[in-house]
Amino acid sequence: MVLSQLGSSLVTALRKMTSSTVVDEEVINTLLKEIETSLLGEDVNPIFIRQMVNNIKKKINSEDIPDGIDKRKLIKDSVFEELINLVDPKTEAFKPKKGKTCVLMMVGLQGAGKTTTITKLALYYKNRGYKPAVVGADTFRAGAYEQLQMNAKRAGVPFFGIKEESDPVKVASEGVRTFRKEKNDIILVDTSGRHKQDKELFKEMQSVRDAIKPDSIIFVMDGAIGQAAFGQAKAFKDAVEVGSVIITKLDGHSNGGGALSAVAATKSPIIFIGTGEKVNEIEEFDAESFVRKLLGMGDLKGIAKLAKDFAENAEYKTMVKHLQEGTLTVRDWKEQLSNLQKMGQLGNIMQMIGLNHPMFQGGNIEKKFKVFMVILDSMTDRELDGSAKTMLNDESRIRRLARGSGRDIREVNELFEQIKLFQQCIDRLPKAMRAQLGNCNAQPNEAAMMQQMQRMLPKGVNQAQLQQLMKQMNAAGLGGTGKKGKK
């Protein structure tokens, strides 16, 4: 996870406070000192930390706490709120709309990962039903044209560039004009970077901006620079009216917290963070969701948004229909597994849910799902359109699949047992509850749903985790039997 060491330190500090026999001034001061030390270790500006600590102290002043108020909960809530304030610029960013062309101009220093981020962003939007295209207007860096062209091809998105052209304004203008005609709804324009901020760089960016008139300018910056991000983000914002920021390389450095808080202080909205080198390792940034995952609280908002994106695809609707009818096919399972992998890392999805059971651990489940996909890719159309139960009853097919996929017979059996178990879980639901599968407008009856789900989950998942998972299912459109609203 991004900033996992910081998250671990903060969680440990809060647990110490919670387990204290008496929460007095000494316990509170120890907690705040540990939080301060943890944030300093992430290169967060000491001024920001001091302001945060003072805000927490004001909220938990013992003299102002009424009788009957849970002091431990008040302290935890105050820390949670102030951590959000630390990384939240409280400024809305531009959001593209499907079917309406928008031009996004990408700027940043050389080495920040701008060209790679453009590809990640294009694939992110492509997987959510947009028609993105990329324009290679970085005419300064050697190899920029070839890198973006190759990345775009791998991501399956259109690319425009003029290899021998040295004028970035001409390339950007022609690229935007071309993709407007082709009705692409997101046009991502790569621009030249430099090793440092200089007048020449800003002048070139301003010329490109004036020529293509972007709907938003996105500044891509390296998270490794820590609190120095404040000056860098402010300089770019003042030069070309940066509309939002993407912070890269947050997975491998201890300065990420400093970068996030510094950018937030410039009032520039952070829209995405880079979480790894892979093309799908980019996350939409939301301050509350980020802090929830940091503290291991689960991210209801994030999983609900993911579920909304997920539920819009036609394959999902087909799967819901088959689940309701009790006719789930192996192909349904394969398509949804593929969609999950496109939407983002499975480990990140498990963090959103906030479950710590071994079967839900990110690394384990990603490795397992990759094995499952290898097996599924070895199946014939006839086998894919059949049921898991049919496959389990045919030992010769199981052996053939194991040989064809290069996997163990045990792994092949495990795949079909998982699919079979999933269908059985749905079959155990009452008919009224099953009828609401996929209905995002239904209001769930949580008590009834909890009783039904207790038999479905593995041992070791506690009541709180079960309730949280149930909320996620409702957010995903796997709702309960509550009454529908009036039409």
Swiss-Prot record:
<keyword id="KW-0378">Hydrolase</keyword>
<keyword id="KW-0733">Signal recognition particle</keyword>
<dbReference type="GO" id="GO:0005829">
    <property type="term" value="C:cytosol"/>
</dbReference>
<feature type="region of interest" description="G-domain">
    <location>
        <begin position="1"/>
        <end position="295"/>
    </location>
</feature>
<dbReference type="Pfam" id="PF02978">
    <property type="entry name" value="SRP_SPB"/>
</dbReference>
<keyword id="KW-0963">Cytoplasm</keyword>
<dbReference type="InterPro" id="IPR036225">
    <property type="entry name" value="SRP/SRP_N"/>
</dbReference>
<feature type="binding site">
    <location>
        <begin position="248"/>
        <end position="251"/>
    </location>
    <ligand>
        <name>GTP</name>
    </ligand>
</feature>
<dbReference type="GO" id="GO:0005525">
    <property type="term" value="F:GTP binding"/>
</dbReference>
<dbReference type="GO" id="GO:0005783">
    <property type="term" value="C:endoplasmic reticulum"/>
</dbReference>
<keyword id="KW-0256">Endoplasmic reticulum</keyword>
<dbReference type="Pfam" id="PF02881">
    <property type="entry name" value="SRP54_N"/>
</dbReference>
<feature type="binding site">
    <location>
        <begin position="108"/>
        <end position="115"/>
    </location>
    <ligand>
        <name>GTP</name>
    </ligand>
</feature>
<comment type="function">
    <text>Component of the signal recognition particle (SRP) complex, a ribonucleoprotein complex that mediates the cotranslational targeting of secretory and membrane proteins to the endoplasmic reticulum (ER). As part of the SRP complex, associates with the SRP receptor (SR) component SRPRA to target secretory proteins to the endoplasmic reticulum membrane. Binds to the signal sequence of presecretory proteins when they emerge from the ribosomes. Displays basal GTPase activity, and stimulates reciprocal GTPase activation of the SR subunit SRPRA.</text>
</comment>
<protein>
    <recommendedName>
        <fullName>Signal recognition particle subunit SRP54</fullName>
        <ecNumber>3.6.5.4</ecNumber>
    </recommendedName>
</protein>
<dbReference type="GO" id="GO:0003924">
    <property type="term" value="F:GTPase activity"/>
</dbReference>
<comment type="similarity">
    <text>Belongs to the GTP-binding SRP family. SRP54 subfamily.</text>
</comment>
<dbReference type="InterPro" id="IPR022941">
    <property type="entry name" value="SRP54"/>
</dbReference>
<feature type="region of interest" description="M-domain">
    <location>
        <begin position="296"/>
        <end position="487"/>
    </location>
</feature>
<dbReference type="InterPro" id="IPR006325">
    <property type="entry name" value="SRP54_euk"/>
</dbReference>
<dbReference type="GO" id="GO:0008312">
    <property type="term" value="F:7S RNA binding"/>
</dbReference>
<dbReference type="InterPro" id="IPR000897">
    <property type="entry name" value="SRP54_GTPase_dom"/>
</dbReference>
<dbReference type="GO" id="GO:0005786">
    <property type="term" value="C:signal recognition particle, endoplasmic reticulum targeting"/>
</dbReference>
<keyword id="KW-0694">RNA-binding</keyword>
<keyword id="KW-0687">Ribonucleoprotein</keyword>
<dbReference type="Pfam" id="PF00448">
    <property type="entry name" value="SRP54"/>
</dbReference>
<dbReference type="InterPro" id="IPR036891">
    <property type="entry name" value="Signal_recog_part_SRP54_M_sf"/>
</dbReference>
<feature type="binding site">
    <location>
        <begin position="190"/>
        <end position="194"/>
    </location>
    <ligand>
        <name>GTP</name>
    </ligand>
</feature>
<dbReference type="InterPro" id="IPR027417">
    <property type="entry name" value="P-loop_NTPase"/>
</dbReference>
<comment type="subunit">
    <text>Component of a signal recognition particle (SRP) complex that consists of a 7SL RNA molecule of 300 nucleotides and six protein subunits: SRP72, SRP68, SRP54, SRP19, SRP14 and SRP9.</text>
</comment>
<dbReference type="InterPro" id="IPR013822">
    <property type="entry name" value="Signal_recog_particl_SRP54_hlx"/>
</dbReference>
<dbReference type="GO" id="GO:0006616">
    <property type="term" value="P:SRP-dependent cotranslational protein targeting to membrane, translocation"/>
</dbReference>
<dbReference type="GO" id="GO:0030942">
    <property type="term" value="F:endoplasmic reticulum signal peptide binding"/>
</dbReference>
<dbReference type="InterPro" id="IPR042101">
    <property type="entry name" value="SRP54_N_sf"/>
</dbReference>
<dbReference type="InterPro" id="IPR004125">
    <property type="entry name" value="Signal_recog_particle_SRP54_M"/>
</dbReference>
<keyword id="KW-0547">Nucleotide-binding</keyword>
<keyword id="KW-0342">GTP-binding</keyword>
